[in-house]
Amino acid sequence: MDIPLVVPMPPNWRIDWAVWEAAQPELFADMQRTVDAPFNGDAAHVLENAQTACERLTGLSEFRSLTERQRQIVFLACFFHDVGKTLTTKRIKRQWVAPNHDLRGAELSRYLLWTDYKLAGTMDMLSFREAVSLLVLHHETPLMFQDVLKQGDAESLFSVKSLAANGILVPDFTLELLGVLGLAIATTVDEKEACNRFMETAEKNGYLHEPPKFADDTSRFAFLSRRSNDSDVVVADDTWGEIIMMAGLPGTGKDTWIGRNHPELPMISLDEIRKEIHVLPTEPQEPVVSLAYSRAREFLRNKTPFLWNATNISTDIRNRQLSLFAQYGAAVRIVYLETSVDEQYRRNRNRVAVVPEEAVTRMRRHLVLPTIHEARRVEYIMV
């Protein structure tokens, strides 16, 4: 099934739900089984909530004035905006809750677009897929923007500028699309007003349609990590050198990229440490990680640039390493590699140490790409 088949088009803007459900019956069933009434008054389940929001979206002039590609991105994000509730909804003390449904929804939408629609392996497909995922992740931000405004102009400016910065790596993501999504899922007058204020603030400061510009990588990272309050100030680089952190699923060619681009750097490779101490990828990894961190600290104490070679597919894992590197005054460059689904599986099967395909699938399901906020330099490279 192609994406255009499920996205309403002019002149009638009709949504053919039957076509979509026939292509993804399990997803529709999961959404229909998940209760939503406690969260969205009139909707009995998540599927009804999603369909109602999509119908509202197609009637918005703001949606109809977008380009076809933008409409596809926003429409998919609108349908997926609460899909994370299928994984997180539970009853605690007689109340229904869905903690972190935005994060899990972003992961699930990325996984579905990657596996079902094969949106991987080119920058064009990555940008489309990640724009949808980012919209799902941040779908509640416009609805709650009134709370941000109460914190003052400086905080509201940082909020929109920091969010818009995602467009540096993901050009298809804009605050205009996030605002339009907000208008579609808003169910109260206050939420709609908050969305309008969000878009007005973004447009006033020049970030509605494009990401902000910064003097250089150091100044950008200082602002986004809140070490600098003024995004227009050039911040001096006080680091002694750069650590390269690799990221990407098994079989994306990290070793090959390293050999071609930085054979001169000493490397900490979790794969090599596993071989060294005879630990399988499916076994507990604490001994592997402990030895890797010990060697990293030695390089850092000696102010020796090095390369950290591992999958690094989650924000939590990366943050632990980034925190360590920052403690020693090092700058970091994150290099994320991606290839198509079929090519990634082929390369993994040809590895000396093959990672079981079910493990790779599990990793892809929970993969979170590094963002521009995480390090001084972040690169997406298609291989």
PLM ranges: what are they?
Residues 1-92:
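Acidic/His-rich, divalent-metal-binding segments that scaffold phosphate/diphosphate chemistry
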Residues 38-52, 93-107, 288, 311-314:
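Active-site metal-coordination segments of metallo-dependent hydrolases
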Residues 59, 63-194:
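Divalent metal-dependent catalytic cores for phosphoryl transfer on phosphate-bearing substrates
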Residues 202-238:
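N-terminal pre-Walker A segment at the start of P-loop NTPase domains
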Residues 242-262:
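Glycine-rich phosphate-binding P-loop
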Residues 255-306, 342-345:
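Conserved substrate/cofactor phosphate-moiety recognition/catalytic segment
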Residues 264, 342-383:
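Conserved GTP-binding G-domain of TRAFAC-class P-loop NTPases and closely related GTPase folds
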Residues 328-347:
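Conserved phosphate-donor/acceptor-positioning beta-strand/loop module used by diverse small-molecule
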